[in-house]
Curated annotation (Swiss-Prot):
Transmembrane segments: none annotated. This is Pancreatic trypsin inhibitor. Pfam families: Kunitz_BPTI. SUPFAM superfamilies: BPTI-like. Its main location: secreted. Residues 40-90 form the BPTI/Kunitz inhibitor domain. Disulfide bonds join C40-C90, C49-C73, C65-C86. One of its GO terms (molecular function) is potassium channel inhibitor activity. Residues 1-21 form the signal peptide.
Length: 100
C-alpha cells in the first residue's frame, strides 16, 4: 500500500511539473519582449558627423546586439558603448561583429 501511494505521489508531481512548464505564462522569452524598450526596435543611426566610432545596437530582426559605425553626434537611443549595455537594455545575445 505504501509503495502504491509513493508511485501515485511521484506520478502527480511529474504531471504537475509538466503542466507548469507548458503553461503560456511560464514563457520567459515573451516576458523579455514585453519589457524591451521601444527604441530597441529602431535601426542603427550613424548621424551626420564623420567620426568612425564602433558602437552596438539591438537588431530586432536578428534578436541580438551587433556593431555599427557611429558618426559621433546626434545619437539615437539604440546606440550603446558596449555589447553588455546593449544586452542589458534590449536583451538578446551578442552577434557577429561585422558592420552592417
Amino acid at each position: 500500500m505504501k509503495m502504491s501511494r509513493l508511485c501515485l505521489s511521484v506520478a502527480l508531481l511529474v504531471l504537475l511539473g509538466t503542466l507548469a512548464a507548458s503553461t503560456p505564462g511560464c514563457d520567459t522569452s515573451n516576458q523579455a519582449k514585453a519589457q524591451r524598450p521601444d527604441f530597441c526596435l529602431e535601426p542603427p543611426y550613424t548621424g551626420p558627423c564623420k567620426a568612425r566610432i564602433i558602437r552596438y545596437f539591438y537588431n530586432a530582426k536578428a534578436g541580438l546586439c551587433q556593431t555599427f559605425v557611429y558618426g559621433g553626434c546626434r545619437a539615437k537611443r539604440n546606440n550603446f558603448k558596449s555589447a553588455e549595455d546593449c544586452m542589458r537594455t534590449c536583451g538578446g545575445a551578442i552577434g557577429p561583429w561585422e558592420n552592417l
